[in-house]
């Protein structure tokens, strides 16, 4: 048999490392298409000249674009037969990615636990994205609910990894050369620096985007993400194509420009949950909350820990859960990340 039906829960072994196929050379074409698919306007990843003024050799690609490219490499081996992508932790961007870089990915299985229904289980993996020099550019943990091929297959001994609640500010990687000494607030689009944000502050990002069927499938193909639920309408009982969760992340992040234009680089992903599914026709809006602030090794660069929530139009902002503790039906995404901001 020459075709690949993908892995099922019983195919994973604790401690195994999976080298994912098909390296990807990044070009300016991907960046142009990213900016066409999402309302991306952050200056550092838009302008070579702005990036050079900030000490970088050129404009890096958007950090989430690098994430999607690495994530897409993992799908055929990790989540082709997934029921749902459940969460993220311990994500760190370690080096900027520039056009011309070639990315590949590898994942190590760090946890396995069969569900009580015996029909699926949860797989935890730590994924690394590597460039052409073999340098890690990105590392993160995610956990996925995966179907079993044979419900009678014996369950592995349950192993649930202990994961950090957040990435410590001292572990944030400031890209080599990055300096905001000559940062141009006018060109960046907003006057707000690190000191202008207060812990507990909440920001409604005002704008919204209605998701189109063709756009979300085009974006998911751009990342070479082959998960069946995003393309095949016969793969779900409701006959609908599920929007790739990363598509919602990028929509929310780019909408956050309105209020967080100077949050120029994402450097860590503390946690994340796809609270409810998103489908074509949904209009996505976003709000943020400042969870923490930290100084960095560079006196001109500060870090903001931000909570980014994506919600469907009509959902009340700044509220995520009902009285029973469950996410409200209109909440799509609840993401916790660190970003670099000029001081």
Swiss-Prot record:
Disruption phenotype: Cells lacking this gene are not able to grow on acetate as a sole carbon source.
Highest taxon of the lineage: Bacteria
One Pfam short name: MC_hydratase
Gene3D superfamilies: Hotdog Thioesterase
Lyase among keywords: yes
Gene Ontology molecular functions: oxo-acid-lyase activity
pH dependence (UniProt free text): Optimum pH is 7.5.
Reported induction: Strongly up-regulated during growth on acetate as sole carbon source.
Keyword Lyase: yes
Binding positions for substrate per the UniProt entry: 60-63, 83-86, 94-96
Cross-referenced SUPFAM superfamilies: Thioesterase/thiol ester dehydrase-isomerase
GO terms, biological process: acetate catabolic process
Catalyzed chemical reaction(s): (2R,3S)-beta-methylmalyl-CoA = 2-methylfumaryl-CoA + H2O
EC number: 4.2.1.148
Domain MaoC-like, chain residue ranges per copy: 47-116
Alphabetized UniProt keyword annotations: Lyase
Disulfide topology: none
Known role: Involved in the ethylmalonyl-CoA pathway for acetate assimilation. Catalyzes the reversible hydration of mesaconyl-CoA (2-methylfumaryl-CoA) to yield beta-methylmalyl-CoA ((2R,3S)-beta-methylmalyl-CoA).
Name of the molecule in the record: Mesaconyl-CoA hydratase
């Amino acid at each position: 048999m020459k075709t690949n039906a993908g892995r099922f829960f019983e195919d994973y072994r604790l401690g195994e490392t999976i080298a994912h196929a098909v390296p990807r050379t990044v070009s300016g074409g991907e960046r142009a298409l990213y900016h066409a698919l999402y309302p991306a306007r952050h200056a550092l990843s838009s302008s070579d000249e702005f990036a050079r003024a900030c000490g970088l050799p050129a404009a890096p690609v958007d950090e989430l674009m690098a994430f999607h490219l690495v994530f897409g490499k993992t799908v055929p081996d990790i989540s082709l037969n997934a029921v749902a992508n459940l969460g993220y932790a311990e994500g760190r961007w370690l080096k900027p990615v520039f056009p011309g870089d070639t990315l590949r990915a590898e994942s190590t299985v760090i946890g396995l636990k069969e569900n009580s229904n015996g029909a699926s289980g949860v797989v935890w993996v730590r994924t690394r994205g590597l460039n052409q020099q073999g340098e890690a550019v990105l590392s993160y943990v995610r956990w996925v609910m995966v179907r079993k091929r044979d419900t009678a297959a014996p369950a592995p001994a349950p192993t649930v990894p202990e994961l950090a609640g957040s990435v410590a500010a001292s572990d944030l990687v400031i890209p080599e050369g990055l300096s905001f000494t000559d940062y141009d607030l006018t060109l960046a689009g907003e006057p707000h620096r690190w000191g202008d944000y207060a812990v507990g502050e909440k920001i409604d990002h005002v704008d919204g985007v209605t998701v189109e069927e063709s756009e979300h499938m085009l974006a998911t193909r751009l990342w070479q993400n082959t998960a069946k639920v995003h393309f095949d309408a016969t793969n779900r009982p409701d006959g609908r194509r599920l929007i790739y969760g990363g598509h919602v992340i990028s929509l929310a992040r780019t909408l956050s420009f309105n209020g967080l234009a100077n949050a120029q680089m994402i450097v860590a992903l503390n946690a994340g949950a796809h609270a409810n599914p998103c489908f074509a026709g949904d209009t996505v809006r976003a709000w943020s909350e400042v969870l923490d602030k930290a100084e960095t090794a560079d006196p001109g660069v500060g870090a903001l820990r931000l909570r980014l929530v994506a919600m469907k139009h009509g959902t009340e902002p700044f509220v995520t859960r009902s009285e029973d503790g469950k996410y409200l039906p209109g909440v799509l995404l609840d993401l916790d990340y660190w970003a670099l901001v000029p001081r």
